[in-house]
Amino acid sequence: MKQIPYATQWIEEDDILAVADALRSSNLTQGPLVDEFEKSMAQYCGAKYAVAVSNGTAALHIACLAAGVSAGAEVITSAITFAASANCVLYCGGKPVFADIEPGTALIDPLDIRKKLTKKTKAIIPVHFAGQPADMEEISKIAKENNLIIIEDAAHAIRAKYRLKNSQDWIKVGSCFHSDMTILSFHAVKQLTTGEGGMVLTNDHNLYEKLVFFRSHGITRSVKYMKETEGPWYYEMHELGFNYRLTDIQCALGISQLKKLDKFIARRKEIAGMYDDAFSKIEQIDFIKEKEGFDSSRHLYVILVENRRNIFNWLIAETNIGVNVHYIPVYFHPYYKRLGYERGLCPMAEEYYSRAISIPMFPKLANDEVEYVIRKIKKVVAE
Protein backbone atom coordinates (compact mmCIF):
# COMPACT_ATOMS: atom_id res chain seq x y z
CA MET A 1 0.00 0.00 0.00
CA LYS A 2 1.33 3.44 -0.97
CA GLN A 3 1.70 6.26 1.54
CA ILE A 4 -1.71 7.56 2.64
CA PRO A 5 -1.65 11.18 3.87
CA TYR A 6 -4.11 12.34 6.51
CA ALA A 7 -5.40 14.88 3.94
CA THR A 8 -4.64 16.15 0.45
CA GLN A 9 -6.23 18.20 -2.32
CA TRP A 10 -8.18 16.84 -5.29
CA ILE A 11 -7.04 18.62 -8.44
CA GLU A 12 -8.43 17.53 -11.81
CA GLU A 13 -7.75 18.53 -15.40
CA ASP A 14 -10.52 21.15 -15.45
CA ASP A 15 -8.89 22.86 -12.46
CA ILE A 16 -5.54 22.95 -14.27
CA LEU A 17 -7.15 24.35 -17.42
CA ALA A 18 -8.93 27.06 -15.41
CA VAL A 19 -5.65 28.14 -13.82
CA ALA A 20 -3.89 28.05 -17.21
CA ASP A 21 -6.58 30.30 -18.68
CA ALA A 22 -6.06 32.76 -15.83
CA LEU A 23 -2.32 32.75 -16.44
CA ARG A 24 -2.93 33.58 -20.11
CA SER A 25 -5.25 36.46 -19.23
CA SER A 26 -4.31 40.11 -18.77
CA ASN A 27 -5.20 40.04 -15.06
CA LEU A 28 -3.17 37.87 -12.70
CA THR A 29 -4.48 39.78 -9.68
CA GLN A 30 -7.17 42.37 -8.86
CA GLY A 31 -9.07 41.23 -11.95
CA PRO A 32 -12.61 39.99 -12.70
CA LEU A 33 -12.13 36.45 -11.38
CA VAL A 34 -11.88 37.74 -7.81
CA ASP A 35 -15.32 39.32 -8.08
CA GLU A 36 -16.71 36.21 -9.78
CA PHE A 37 -15.37 33.93 -7.05
CA GLU A 38 -16.75 36.17 -4.32
CA LYS A 39 -20.21 36.33 -5.89
CA SER A 40 -20.26 32.58 -6.55
CA MET A 41 -19.31 31.76 -2.98
CA ALA A 42 -21.76 34.27 -1.49
CA GLN A 43 -24.55 32.75 -3.57
CA TYR A 44 -23.52 29.21 -2.66
CA CYS A 45 -23.49 29.97 1.07
CA GLY A 46 -26.53 32.26 1.06
CA ALA A 47 -24.79 35.47 2.15
CA LYS A 48 -25.09 38.94 0.63
CA TYR A 49 -21.40 39.82 0.50
CA ALA A 50 -18.05 38.05 0.29
CA VAL A 51 -14.49 39.35 0.55
CA ALA A 52 -11.75 37.03 -0.74
CA VAL A 53 -8.41 37.19 1.06
CA SER A 54 -5.02 35.50 1.03
CA ASN A 55 -5.78 32.89 3.72
CA GLY A 56 -8.13 32.00 6.56
CA THR A 57 -5.94 33.76 9.12
CA ALA A 58 -6.20 37.01 7.14
CA ALA A 59 -9.97 36.51 7.05
CA LEU A 60 -10.07 36.22 10.84
CA HIS A 61 -7.82 39.26 11.23
CA ILE A 62 -9.87 41.63 9.09
CA ALA A 63 -13.11 40.29 10.59
CA CYS A 64 -11.83 41.20 14.05
CA LEU A 65 -10.76 44.63 12.80
CA ALA A 66 -14.17 45.21 11.21
CA ALA A 67 -15.82 44.12 14.47
CA GLY A 68 -13.87 46.78 16.35
CA VAL A 69 -11.70 44.46 18.42
CA SER A 70 -8.97 46.58 19.99
CA ALA A 71 -6.85 46.98 23.11
CA GLY A 72 -8.72 45.92 26.23
CA ALA A 73 -11.36 43.90 24.39
CA GLU A 74 -11.89 40.23 25.20
CA VAL A 75 -12.97 37.71 22.57
CA ILE A 76 -14.14 34.22 23.50
CA THR A 77 -13.13 31.31 21.28
CA SER A 78 -12.61 27.56 21.53
CA ALA A 79 -9.60 26.01 23.23
CA ILE A 80 -9.57 23.30 20.54
CA THR A 81 -8.76 25.07 17.31
CA PHE A 82 -5.85 26.19 15.18
CA ALA A 83 -3.96 29.03 16.84
CA ALA A 84 -5.19 31.56 14.26
CA SER A 85 -8.66 31.61 15.86
CA ALA A 86 -7.07 33.25 18.89
CA ASN A 87 -4.07 34.95 17.29
CA CYS A 88 -6.38 37.21 15.28
CA VAL A 89 -7.53 38.75 18.56
CA LEU A 90 -3.94 39.41 19.64
CA TYR A 91 -3.20 41.05 16.28
CA CYS A 92 -5.84 43.66 17.17
CA GLY A 93 -4.54 44.20 20.70
CA GLY A 94 -7.34 42.22 22.32
CA LYS A 95 -7.29 39.27 24.72
CA PRO A 96 -8.39 35.76 23.68
CA VAL A 97 -10.51 34.00 26.30
CA PHE A 98 -10.78 30.23 25.91
CA ALA A 99 -14.04 28.36 26.39
CA ASP A 100 -14.15 24.62 26.95
CA ILE A 101 -15.63 22.08 24.55
CA GLU A 102 -18.56 19.70 24.60
CA PRO A 103 -17.54 16.08 25.20
CA GLY A 104 -18.19 13.92 22.16
CA THR A 105 -18.07 16.70 19.55
CA ALA A 106 -15.08 18.92 20.48
CA LEU A 107 -17.32 21.91 19.69
CA ILE A 108 -17.22 25.06 21.80
CA ASP A 109 -19.59 24.72 24.77
CA PRO A 110 -22.19 27.53 25.04
CA LEU A 111 -22.47 26.93 28.79
CA ASP A 112 -18.78 27.67 29.22
CA ILE A 113 -19.06 30.71 26.96
CA ARG A 114 -21.55 32.12 29.47
CA LYS A 115 -19.12 31.45 32.31
CA LYS A 116 -16.32 33.31 30.50
CA LEU A 117 -18.30 36.50 29.83
CA THR A 118 -17.05 39.73 31.42
CA LYS A 119 -17.78 43.41 30.96
CA LYS A 120 -14.83 43.49 28.54
CA THR A 121 -16.21 40.80 26.20
CA LYS A 122 -16.55 42.24 22.70
CA ALA A 123 -17.09 39.21 20.48
CA ILE A 124 -17.37 35.43 20.21
CA ILE A 125 -15.52 33.35 17.61
CA PRO A 126 -17.26 29.94 17.64
CA VAL A 127 -15.28 27.29 15.78
CA HIS A 128 -17.12 24.77 13.62
CA PHE A 129 -14.82 21.86 14.37
CA ALA A 130 -14.02 19.04 11.91
CA GLY A 131 -16.87 20.15 9.64
CA GLN A 132 -19.67 20.22 12.23
CA PRO A 133 -21.31 23.53 13.19
CA ALA A 134 -21.31 24.75 16.76
CA ASP A 135 -24.64 25.42 18.52
CA MET A 136 -25.22 28.73 16.78
CA GLU A 137 -28.77 29.21 18.06
CA GLU A 138 -27.60 29.21 21.67
CA ILE A 139 -24.46 31.22 20.92
CA SER A 140 -26.56 33.80 19.06
CA LYS A 141 -28.83 34.08 22.08
CA ILE A 142 -25.82 34.76 24.31
CA ALA A 143 -24.54 37.39 21.88
CA LYS A 144 -27.87 39.21 21.66
CA GLU A 145 -28.27 39.26 25.43
CA ASN A 146 -24.82 40.82 25.81
CA ASN A 147 -24.59 42.96 22.65
CA LEU A 148 -21.68 40.94 21.23
CA ILE A 149 -20.37 40.43 17.70
CA ILE A 150 -20.23 36.86 16.36
CA ILE A 151 -17.54 35.80 13.88
CA GLU A 152 -18.07 32.18 12.82
CA ASP A 153 -14.82 30.34 12.19
CA ALA A 154 -16.00 27.99 9.47
CA ALA A 155 -12.54 27.13 8.15
CA HIS A 156 -13.56 23.46 8.54
CA ALA A 157 -17.20 23.75 7.63
CA ILE A 158 -18.00 25.04 4.16
CA ARG A 159 -21.30 23.43 3.04
CA ALA A 160 -22.19 22.30 6.56
CA LYS A 161 -25.64 23.14 7.90
CA TYR A 162 -27.81 22.82 10.98
CA ARG A 163 -31.54 22.57 11.64
CA LEU A 164 -33.35 25.17 13.71
CA LYS A 165 -34.55 23.61 16.95
CA ASN A 166 -38.20 24.67 16.68
CA SER A 167 -38.67 24.13 12.96
CA GLN A 168 -37.56 21.98 10.08
CA ASP A 169 -35.58 24.78 8.45
CA TRP A 170 -31.93 24.09 7.71
CA ILE A 171 -29.39 26.91 7.99
CA LYS A 172 -26.29 26.93 5.79
CA VAL A 173 -22.97 27.73 7.39
CA GLY A 174 -21.80 30.92 5.71
CA SER A 175 -25.27 32.44 5.45
CA CYS A 176 -24.53 34.45 8.63
CA PHE A 177 -28.06 33.67 9.86
CA HIS A 178 -26.83 33.67 13.47
CA SER A 179 -23.68 35.76 13.08
CA ASP A 180 -22.26 39.04 11.86
CA MET A 181 -19.50 37.44 9.78
CA THR A 182 -18.32 33.98 8.78
CA ILE A 183 -14.79 33.12 7.68
CA LEU A 184 -13.75 30.32 5.33
CA SER A 185 -10.38 28.77 4.53
CA PHE A 186 -9.26 27.36 1.19
CA HIS A 187 -6.00 25.76 2.29
CA ALA A 188 -4.89 22.68 0.37
CA VAL A 189 -6.34 20.22 2.92
CA LYS A 190 -9.76 21.89 3.06
CA GLN A 191 -12.90 20.71 1.25
CA LEU A 192 -12.25 23.27 -1.50
CA THR A 193 -8.83 24.71 -2.21
CA THR A 194 -7.15 27.68 -3.83
CA GLY A 195 -3.77 26.52 -2.52
CA GLU A 196 -3.86 29.22 0.12
CA GLY A 197 -6.89 31.44 0.47
CA GLY A 198 -9.75 32.57 2.63
CA MET A 199 -12.95 34.59 2.64
CA VAL A 200 -15.20 36.62 4.91
CA LEU A 201 -18.95 36.44 4.37
CA THR A 202 -21.44 38.93 5.80
CA ASN A 203 -24.93 40.35 5.30
CA ASP A 204 -23.99 43.74 6.76
CA HIS A 205 -23.00 46.32 4.13
CA ASN A 206 -21.12 48.48 6.64
CA LEU A 207 -19.01 45.51 7.71
CA TYR A 208 -18.47 44.60 4.06
CA GLU A 209 -17.08 48.05 3.28
CA LYS A 210 -14.71 47.85 6.25
CA LEU A 211 -13.53 44.40 5.19
CA VAL A 212 -12.75 45.63 1.68
CA PHE A 213 -10.71 48.50 3.11
CA PHE A 214 -8.72 46.29 5.48
CA ARG A 215 -8.00 43.74 2.74
CA SER A 216 -6.14 46.19 0.50
CA HIS A 217 -4.02 48.67 2.45
CA GLY A 218 -7.05 50.68 3.60
CA ILE A 219 -6.96 52.32 0.17
CA THR A 220 -9.91 53.32 -2.01
CA ARG A 221 -10.34 54.74 -5.50
CA SER A 222 -14.08 55.27 -5.02
CA VAL A 223 -15.21 58.90 -5.03
CA LYS A 224 -17.88 57.85 -2.53
CA TYR A 225 -15.27 57.77 0.23
CA MET A 226 -12.73 60.35 -0.91
CA LYS A 227 -12.14 63.61 0.91
CA GLU A 228 -11.00 65.12 -2.38
CA THR A 229 -10.15 63.94 -5.88
CA GLU A 230 -7.66 64.97 -8.53
CA GLY A 231 -8.76 62.67 -11.32
CA PRO A 232 -9.28 58.99 -12.20
CA TRP A 233 -5.75 58.07 -11.11
CA TYR A 234 -6.29 59.38 -7.57
CA TYR A 235 -6.60 57.17 -4.48
CA GLU A 236 -6.70 57.67 -0.72
CA MET A 237 -5.75 55.57 2.30
CA HIS A 238 -8.47 55.70 4.95
CA GLU A 239 -7.53 52.81 7.24
CA LEU A 240 -4.34 51.04 8.31
CA GLY A 241 -5.01 48.07 6.06
CA PHE A 242 -2.99 45.12 4.79
CA ASN A 243 -2.10 43.39 1.55
CA TYR A 244 -4.39 40.40 2.01
CA ARG A 245 -5.54 40.12 -1.61
CA LEU A 246 -6.25 36.81 -3.34
CA THR A 247 -5.03 36.51 -6.94
CA ASP A 248 -7.10 35.80 -10.04
CA ILE A 249 -5.01 32.66 -10.51
CA GLN A 250 -6.18 31.32 -7.16
CA CYS A 251 -9.75 32.47 -7.75
CA ALA A 252 -9.79 30.58 -11.06
CA LEU A 253 -9.00 27.42 -9.12
CA GLY A 254 -11.62 28.27 -6.49
CA ILE A 255 -14.35 28.80 -9.10
CA SER A 256 -13.51 25.45 -10.70
CA GLN A 257 -13.40 23.65 -7.35
CA LEU A 258 -16.70 25.15 -6.19
CA LYS A 259 -18.49 23.45 -9.09
CA LYS A 260 -17.40 20.08 -7.63
CA LEU A 261 -17.75 20.81 -3.93
CA ASP A 262 -20.98 18.83 -3.51
CA LYS A 263 -19.25 15.80 -5.04
CA PHE A 264 -16.27 16.21 -2.72
CA ILE A 265 -18.47 16.43 0.38
CA ALA A 266 -20.57 13.44 -0.67
CA ARG A 267 -17.43 11.31 -0.89
CA ARG A 268 -16.21 12.55 2.49
CA LYS A 269 -19.53 11.43 3.98
CA GLU A 270 -19.17 7.98 2.41
CA ILE A 271 -15.72 7.60 3.98
CA ALA A 272 -16.98 8.82 7.35
CA GLY A 273 -19.79 6.27 7.17
CA MET A 274 -17.29 3.45 6.61
CA TYR A 275 -15.24 4.61 9.59
CA ASP A 276 -18.32 5.03 11.80
CA ASP A 277 -19.55 1.55 10.97
CA ALA A 278 -16.17 -0.05 11.73
CA PHE A 279 -15.21 1.86 14.87
CA SER A 280 -18.64 1.74 16.51
CA LYS A 281 -18.01 -2.01 16.95
CA ILE A 282 -14.68 -1.55 18.77
CA GLU A 283 -14.95 -0.86 22.48
CA GLN A 284 -11.50 0.73 22.75
CA ILE A 285 -12.25 3.37 20.09
CA ASP A 286 -14.52 6.38 20.36
CA PHE A 287 -14.88 9.04 17.69
CA ILE A 288 -16.29 12.52 17.13
CA LYS A 289 -20.05 12.19 16.72
CA GLU A 290 -22.35 14.05 14.35
CA LYS A 291 -25.19 15.49 16.43
CA GLU A 292 -28.82 15.09 15.40
CA GLY A 293 -29.95 18.13 13.46
CA PHE A 294 -26.41 18.90 12.30
CA ASP A 295 -24.98 18.10 8.87
CA SER A 296 -21.17 17.99 8.94
CA SER A 297 -19.08 18.59 5.85
CA ARG A 298 -16.55 16.11 7.27
CA HIS A 299 -13.30 18.04 7.09
CA LEU A 300 -11.63 15.75 9.67
CA TYR A 301 -12.21 12.31 11.10
CA VAL A 302 -11.04 12.14 14.71
CA ILE A 303 -10.81 8.95 16.77
CA LEU A 304 -10.39 9.00 20.54
CA VAL A 305 -8.22 6.35 22.17
CA GLU A 306 -6.35 5.65 25.37
CA ASN A 307 -2.55 5.57 25.10
CA ARG A 308 -2.77 8.09 22.25
CA ARG A 309 0.98 8.70 22.16
CA ASN A 310 1.86 5.00 21.75
CA ILE A 311 -0.78 4.36 19.11
CA PHE A 312 0.13 7.51 17.18
CA ASN A 313 3.83 6.64 17.21
CA TRP A 314 3.15 3.06 16.08
CA LEU A 315 1.04 4.22 13.15
CA ILE A 316 3.82 6.60 12.09
CA ALA A 317 6.62 4.05 12.52
CA GLU A 318 5.00 0.81 11.38
CA THR A 319 2.51 1.81 8.69
CA ASN A 320 2.30 4.23 5.79
CA ILE A 321 -0.78 5.93 7.23
CA GLY A 322 -0.57 9.68 7.76
CA VAL A 323 -2.06 10.80 11.06
CA ASN A 324 -2.26 14.11 12.89
CA VAL A 325 -3.66 15.72 16.04
CA HIS A 326 -6.31 18.45 15.85
CA TYR A 327 -5.58 20.27 18.08
CA ILE A 328 -3.22 21.11 20.89
CA PRO A 329 -5.22 23.37 23.24
CA VAL A 330 -4.17 26.83 22.09
CA TYR A 331 -3.11 27.98 25.55
CA PHE A 332 -0.64 25.05 25.80
CA HIS A 333 1.60 26.71 23.22
CA PRO A 334 4.76 28.36 24.64
CA TYR A 335 3.76 31.78 23.31
CA TYR A 336 0.49 31.68 25.23
CA LYS A 337 2.27 30.44 28.34
CA ARG A 338 4.44 33.55 28.14
CA LEU A 339 1.26 35.61 28.11
CA GLY A 340 0.23 34.03 31.41
CA TYR A 341 -2.21 31.33 30.29
CA GLU A 342 -1.97 28.16 32.39
CA ARG A 343 -3.05 24.55 32.00
CA GLY A 344 -6.32 23.63 33.63
CA LEU A 345 -8.39 26.36 31.96
CA CYS A 346 -10.50 23.93 29.91
CA PRO A 347 -10.55 20.39 31.40
CA MET A 348 -12.66 18.81 28.64
CA ALA A 349 -10.35 20.22 25.96
CA GLU A 350 -7.32 18.84 27.76
CA GLU A 351 -8.95 15.42 28.13
CA TYR A 352 -9.87 15.42 24.45
CA TYR A 353 -6.32 16.38 23.43
CA SER A 354 -4.88 13.45 25.39
CA ARG A 355 -6.91 10.99 23.28
CA ALA A 356 -7.39 12.51 19.81
CA ILE A 357 -5.93 11.22 16.54
CA SER A 358 -6.99 12.51 13.11
CA ILE A 359 -6.91 9.72 10.54
CA PRO A 360 -7.01 10.00 6.72
CA MET A 361 -10.02 11.92 5.38
CA PHE A 362 -10.08 13.31 1.85
CA PRO A 363 -12.31 12.60 -1.16
CA LYS A 364 -9.66 10.84 -3.28
CA LEU A 365 -9.24 8.20 -0.56
CA ALA A 366 -10.19 4.88 -2.16
CA ASN A 367 -12.32 2.25 -0.42
CA ASP A 368 -9.43 -0.22 -0.22
CA GLU A 369 -7.33 2.49 1.45
CA VAL A 370 -10.11 3.18 3.97
CA GLU A 371 -10.30 -0.54 4.73
CA TYR A 372 -6.51 -0.68 5.15
CA VAL A 373 -6.62 2.21 7.64
CA ILE A 374 -9.37 0.47 9.58
CA ARG A 375 -7.46 -2.85 9.71
CA LYS A 376 -4.26 -1.22 10.95
CA ILE A 377 -6.03 0.81 13.63
CA LYS A 378 -7.92 -2.28 14.80
CA LYS A 379 -4.61 -4.14 15.01
CA VAL A 380 -2.75 -1.56 17.09
CA VAL A 381 -5.68 -1.00 19.44
CA ALA A 382 -6.06 -4.74 20.01
CA GLU A 383 -2.37 -5.06 20.84
Placement of each model-derived feature along the sequence:
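Phosphate-binding glycine-rich loop
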Residues: N27-E74, C88-C92, F98-D100, K165
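PLP-dependent aminotransferase-like
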Residues: L65-K165
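Glycine-/small-residue-rich active-site loops that bind phosphorylated ligands and cofactors
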Residues: I11, T29, T81, G104-T105, ...
